[in-house]
Amino acid sequence: MLPTIFLLVAMNVFPLFWSLWLSFNDYKASSKIPPKFIGNANYTEMLSRQESWQSFTTTAAFVVMSVLLQLALGFGLALLLNREFKAKGIVTTLFLLPMMLSSVVVGLFWRFLMDTNFGLINFLLGKMGLMDPLKPIVWTDKQHAMWSVVIADTWQWTPFIMLIALAGLASVPKTLFEAASVDRATEWFKFRFITIPTIAPLLMVALLFRTLDAFKMFDLAWIMTERGSTVETVSVQVFREALRNWNTGKACAFAYIVLLVIIGLTNLYLMMMAKIKGEGPADAVPLFNPESPMIRGIGKFAPPVCGVLLIWGAYSAGGPAFVAVIGVLAAICAAIFFIPSNVRNILAYITMSIALFIYLAPLLWMGITSFKPFADVNVIPPKVVFTPTFENYLKIFADAKFMQQMMNSTIIAVVSTVLAVVMGTLTAYAFSRFKIKAKGDALFFILSTRMLPPMVVLVPVYLMFRSLGLLNTLTGLILLYTTVG
């Protein structure tokens, strides 16, 4: 167990302290000149840059938009799936497919779908009269780039919220609903005072993980918006400084500023979770207690406020027609608690089918496109009837590099996963079974590396691997993925 703990500490805590030291130095990783200590000059310069504050603003907007959308849609899908029906397992798995893809693949998917001239989305918007075909939407410009990245991220990670919410809904004791039914409680009462308080802690955990990941988002912004030119998040800013300008010291300083913000957000979430669970002071009122003034106030004022914001956002996004569509959907959602259960189940199945079709549409379209001849790909209107060909697949499998890449990826995935499970289990057992001094500090430092933008952790690891001769080797990648995972 000790070698396992030592390896985890070496691969996680060492980069943390090394990057912290570099943040106080004038240093370029591409240069052989040793670091020169300059105090807090890097922090002062990064905090005085307008680009740094703009990246924080952009990141905050992205986090709020994407995480709230994922929460609403994921929870809604979980409510739809929280019933017994045939093929429930298959339907749930289909909803999880986007989450199984890498962010790079998702970014390429949506960049192709949102292409200004040949994208399917612009074509459909033009056909529905929501866009002038002569003035197609440029999804990579400053006006629309944020929405394009939010849509792609929401599509990929909504199933994560759905999965956790579904697990929470399955754990709600049925006896509570039966007792409420005996008292002739309405469906809205059951939802508000039984369902929500029971699954709130799990939803907070899901929100914590998604907020941390969204705050570090890099792949989608880089791929979908011309290398982050129109959606420059903090991770894009760190990447430019660390691996484009090779200002390693400045990049590390900015990353630690980001880390402090993330730690603050994490503590805020943990405080809210403690209130939800009623683990605060003895005289504290739990956050989701029905008699709590906060909950009563939210229940009174939240619906009209949310309604006004929803109407304003819908009008800004799509005009009166879009407001009408949103209004109809909101009316259906409100009425669902007051209609007979058999009608509600029928509506749930219809909504689930529509949601599944919309969710799988990007995957289906990309699958269809993969069988098109190259000449039929970038054409308007898109060709639905064509002669399928396996030419694209044959070219890929005929490439020797592809087979080698698949082999390398498989080896790294299998070996690192097995080692991560074994090492993680042994380390967790050691931390829980034995009295280890500074156990909390060690866990904090290990988890802190997961809060930093990946590029900052990779710079010290890159320097360490370069000195050990582990660059461009399977051993180095397996070691990295094992300890980070």
PLM regions: where:
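Membrane-helix interface "capping/anchor" motifs
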Residues: F338-R344
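Canonical alpha-helical transmembrane segments of integral membrane proteins
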Residues: F301-W312
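A structural signal for multi-pass alpha-helical bundles of membrane permease subunits
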Residues: M1-V285, W312-V325, L329, C333, ...
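Membrane-interfacial, low-structure loops and terminal tails that flank and connect transmembrane helices
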Residues: G280-G297
